[in-house]
């Protein structure tokens, strides 16, 4: 099955501590998890690695979020939207369900 949320899509968080925030999808881990830029930040206690000249400390990084907790952001309407699929010129493309506009 084709993915409704892909890398570099702008998404909006629907639930959780970051509800309402928008960000760009950095990575799709599996069919059910994505990493979004600036969303779901966690603190990681990092040990120093002298061989790589990396200092230790507490580092903030993005953690994975369930794909069901995000929705694609439609810039034309300024709201979260749903994704549909259709065939155009023999290719399967994604489109916004609210205004039938093709997603890049």
UniProtKB/Swiss-Prot annotation:
GO terms for molecular function: rRNA binding; structural constituent of ribosome. One of its GO terms (biological process) is translation. The keyword Ribosomal protein applies. One of two assembly initiator proteins, it binds directly to the 5'-end of the 23S rRNA, where it nucleates assembly of the 50S subunit. One of the proteins that surrounds the polypeptide exit tunnel on the outside of the subunit. Gene3D superfamilies: 2.30.30.30. Belongs to the universal ribosomal protein uL24 family. InterPro entries: KOW (IPR005824), Rib_uL2_dom2 (IPR014722), Ribosomal_uL24 (IPR003256), Ribosomal_uL24_CS (IPR005825), Ribosomal_uL24_KOW (IPR041988), Translation_prot_SH3-like_sf (IPR008991). One of its GO terms (cellular component) is ribosome. Keywords: Ribonucleoprotein, Ribosomal protein, RNA-binding, rRNA-binding. Pfam families: KOW (PF00467), ribosomal_L24 (PF17136). This is Large ribosomal subunit protein uL24. Part of the 50S ribosomal subunit.
């Amino acid at each position: 099955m084709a993915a409704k949320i892909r890398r570099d899509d702008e998404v909006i968080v629907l639930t959780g501590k970051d509800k309402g925030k928008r960000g760009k999808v950095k990575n799709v881990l599996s069919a059910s998890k994505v990493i979004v830029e600036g969303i779901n930040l966690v603190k990681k206690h990092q040990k120093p690695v002298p061989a790589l000249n990396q200092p230790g400390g507490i580092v903030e990084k993005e953690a994975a979020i369930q794909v069901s907790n995000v929705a694609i952001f439609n810039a034309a309407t300024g709201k979260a939207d749903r994704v549909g699929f259709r065939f155009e010129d023999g290719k399967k493309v994604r489109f916004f369900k609210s205004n039938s506009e093709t997603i890049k």
